[in-house]
Amino acid sequence: FLEHITYGEPNRLEGFLFPDTYDFYVNDDPDRVLEKLLSNFNRKFSDDASAQLETLNTALAERWTAKGYDESYIEAHRMTIYDLVTVASMIEKETASAKESSTIASVIYNRLCDPANYPYLNVDATIVYALGGIDGALTYEDTQIDSPYNTYNRTGLPAGPISNPGLSSISAALNRADTSYYY
């Protein structure tokens, strides 16, 4: 599942270090720790989730086709596991409520499927990530930060995951609510 990640990117494992309870030994080898975290993600992202990702791609392709986008556009925008984890990570940081997660996923996908009218995702959590955290509310100036994670001035998904999402956020990213919400 790491095939879409460029080696050497400083945040390349963000999103794949599954939040869970782990047992480690004092002075455990860092490579062993990473292997355990990544293996757990791989176990949690089951074959069923891979099938759900294909179903999601089919649904998104149908929406893009209905909006007049051609096959090359659709193929270039197929969701990978990396993309899915990126969406799930935004959901994870946008809400603490599992009940709202699938609606937030719907807003993200609705915007991704209508880039002519909604070129930017405008996800506040990506700005907070790009800034390294904030005290207080976001400002207009915050949304203008030059960062590949800024979804206020860059189209499509941010450069990568902004957190390590849990199962409920991954599930929401795979099973979005059926809404017409863009906000």
Q: Where do the model's predicted regions map?
A:
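Bacterial extracytoplasmic/cell-wall-associated proteins, especially those involved in peptidoglycan
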Residues: 2-183
